[in-house]
A protein has these predicted regions:
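Hydrophobic transmembrane alpha-helices and their immediate loop junctions
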Residues: 1-232
Length: 232
């Protein structure tokens, strides 16, 4: 997404369906910081923070598996990395790479998250309707999985590079305007990311506000690199 992230001796490595997965240690730190408000709540505490981290890890892994498995289906061996900005499924497009396949791979991540959302909410309400009394931590895990996969799935479809919505926007723009489609995708990304950053900051949602502020700046930098100068 933003260049290669150097491996460390503390990386967690494993594979899923033959797809290599690497988890950078900063992934855990950022996930913990995002859920640190649980520590200030006397009714919650450390166990609920661990539930949050586990739900973030599982949700992002499923999301990236959506991308990776689709790329693998088309014959392009993928690998997954989870790091401080979330996750990324990497692969080298080969013969047969088309705009429609690019869009399909980009959408497969959010689609996997939405499918997980559907399974989790169906299981959660099914258990409750059956009269099953869930342990508070289990109930909290269901709640967090629903929240993460719905909200992150929707946010990730915003047309801001390098989010999946930005990739889809870029594919559409370059298909319609081969000469300057990347520039139009970056223009759209700057405007949307800037607006979303201001919205989150106005709601005192600092982490997503700063994240989209960073994405706005990143799109601006890429735009300048394409143009050679900052003019529109």
């Amino acid at each position: 997404m933003f260049g290669q992230i150097a491996p460390t001796e503390f990386d967690l490595r494993f594979s899923v369906f033959g797809i290599p997965v690497r988890v950078h240690p900063l992934f855990w730190l950022v996930a913990a910081l995002m859920g640190s408000n649980t520590l200030s709540n006397p009714d919650l505490g450390a166990p609920y923070l661990f539930v949050w981290i586990a739900c973030v890890f599982f949700s992002i892994l499923i999301h990236e598996l959506g991308h990776a498995l689709t790329a693998k289906y088309f014959g392009w061996p993928p690998e997954i990395m989870l790091y401080y900005m979330g996750g990324v499924a990497m692969f080298r497009p080969g013969v047969g790479f088309t705009t429609s396949r690019s869009i399909l791979i980009s959408f497969a991540g959010p689609a996997a998250g939405f499918m997980l959302f559907g399974v989790v909410i169906a299981a959660w309400f099914g258990l409750k309707n059956a009269g099953v009394v869930l342990h508070p931590l289990v109930d909290d895990a269901f709640r967090k999985l629903v929240y993460i996969n719905l909200i992150w799935g929707l946010v990730n479809l915003l047309p801001v590079l390098p989010l999946d919505g930005g990739r889809i926007c870029e594919s559409v723009c370059t298909s319609l305007r081969p000469r300057d489609g990347e520039l139009w995708a970056l223009r759209i990304g700057m405007i949307v990311a800037g607006g979303v950053a201001l919205l989150f900051l106005s709601l005192s949602a600092m982490y997503p506000g700063f994240l989209f502020g960073y994405l706005c700046f990143s799109n601006f930098q890429m735009y300048q690199a394409y143009k050679g100068r900052g003019s529109w």
